[in-house]
Every structure is written in structure tokens, then in C-alpha cells.
Swiss-Prot record:
Full protein name: Superoxide dismutase [Mn/Fe]
GO CC annotation terms, alphabetical: cytoplasm
Positions with a binding annotation for Mn(2+): H27, H81, D161, H165
Coiled coil ranges: none
Details of cofactor binding: Binds 1 Mn(2+) or Fe(3+) ion per subunit.
Keywords, ordered alphabetically: Iron, Manganese, Metal-binding, Oxidoreductase, Stress response
GO MF, any single term: metal ion binding
Record keyword Transmembrane helix present: no
Reactions catalysed, as given in the entry: 2 superoxide + 2 H(+) = H2O2 + O2
Class of enzymatic activity (EC top level): oxidoreductase
UniProt-listed PROSITE patterns: SOD_MN
EC number: 1.15.1.1
Family recorded in the similarity comment: Belongs to the iron/manganese superoxide dismutase family.
Organism per entry: Staphylococcus epidermidis
Length: 199
């Protein structure tokens, strides 16, 4: 069965002024859609068609070598963005078990946000910043390009796209401003749900 572009769970302009409508439209309808189209083209006729995107990305080593890079890039792009849309909301509320766990590990939510923001800003070139569950503990990691922590056996529960296409129309070269705005639209309810499923 072909992979599909998921519908956004909110309107394109719902995250204004933090993430602008035009960026959301291009990011979802063009960038994410291209990953889906290319992924479907590369897995067509292989046994990967029957697998979930999570299963494929978690087991990249078992993907045939001639298509592994294309699957890594486009499969990762599809998985990362599918998760990213769900992790955003116009109604951000900092609550849940995961927030308490963050405070326990980092001392405060602000300390966590600072470390996450620093790592996201320091990610050279294109990539992602993640909060993952690793052996029952929370950890902040970054990945290059469209790599996903699942490939390393870590479960992502919060992710931030730091590719320029995610912010350049509004923030230009000011990635730290985009990262700062991100906290206003984090769907902590979804983060908490993913945390409880992964711990």
C-alpha cells in the first residue's frame, strides 16, 4: 500500500504568528509531499511496501543497499514530518507526566528548553533536534538531514525541524528566533502520549 501525505490536524494559519501560513503550506504540500512521492517510487515492487514507515526507518540496515540512501532520506523525511505536524498545536499547554519528568531530569522546564534550543541552533546545516526516550530516560539529540532517532534505537517524542525550509520565509537566517517561537506551539499532550507509550 502506498504511503500517503497526512492531513494537517489544524489550518495552515493556525500556528500564526509563530509559524506562518505560507511556510506551513509550502512545508506540508510541497516538501513533505515530495518525500512521500519519492518514497513510494523507490519502494514500489519491494517488500517494503507492506511495512510501516516506523518499521522501515528503525531497520534501515535491512533495506537493500541500492535503495538504502533514498529510503533513508525520503522515508525519514516522511516519518519526521508526519510526527512534526502532530507535535504542533495552536493550544499549547505545558502539562503532563512528561513535563514532570523533564523537570526531574533538567531541574526546570526552562533549563531543558535552553539545552534543547542550544543543540538545535548548533546543528550544522540541515537536520532535526529531538527529545527521545532512551532506556527509560529522556535525552536531547540531533540528527543530520532526515535521519530519525529510531534508527539508533531511540524513540522520538518531540522533534524540531531545523532545515531552512522550515523557517526561512519568516525568520531568514535567525534560526534561534524560530526555535524560541516553537515553544509557543508545542503539543505537550501529544509529547506526553508518546512518552507514556515509549517509557
Amino acid at each position: 500500500m502506498a504511503f500517503e501525505l497526512p492531513k494537517l490536524p489544524y489550518a495552515f494559519d493556525a500556528l500564526e504568528p509563530h509559524i506562518d501560513k505560507e511556510t506551513m503550506e509550502i512545508h506540508h504540500d510541497k516538501h513533505h509531499n515530495t518525500y512521500v512521492t519519492k518514497l513510494n517510487a523507490v519502494v514500489e515492487g519491494t517488500d517494503l511496501e507492506a511495512k510501516s514507515i516506523e518499521e522501515i526507518v528503525a531497520n534501515l540496515d535491512s533495506v537493500p543497499s541500492d535503495i538504502q540512501t533514498a529510503v533513508r532520506n525520503n522515508g525519514g523525511g516522511h516519518l519526521n514530518h508526519s510526527l512534526f505536524w502532530e507535535l504542533l498545536t495552536p493550544n499549547s499547554e505545558e502539562k503532563g507526566e512528561v513535563v514532570e519528568k523533564i523537570k526531574e531530569q533538567w531541574g526546570s522546564l526552562d533549563e531543558f528548553k535552553k539545552e534543547f534550543a542550544d543543540k538545535a541552533a548548533a546543528r550544522f546545516g540541515s537536520g532535526w533536534a529531538w527529545l527521545v526516550v532512551n532506556n527509560g530516560q529522556l535525552e536531547i539529540v540531533t540528527t543530520p538531514n532526515q535521519d530519525n532517532p529510531l534508527t539508533e534505537g531511540k524513540t522520538p517524542i518531540l522533534g524540531l525541524d531545523v532545515w531552512e525550509h522550515a523557517y526561512y520565509l519568516k525568520y531568514q537566517n535567525k534560526r534561534p528566533d524560530y526555535i524560541s517561537a516553537f515553544w509557543n506551539v508545542v503539543n505537550w499532550e501529544k509529547v506526553d502520549e508518546l512518552y507514556n507509550a515509549a517509557k
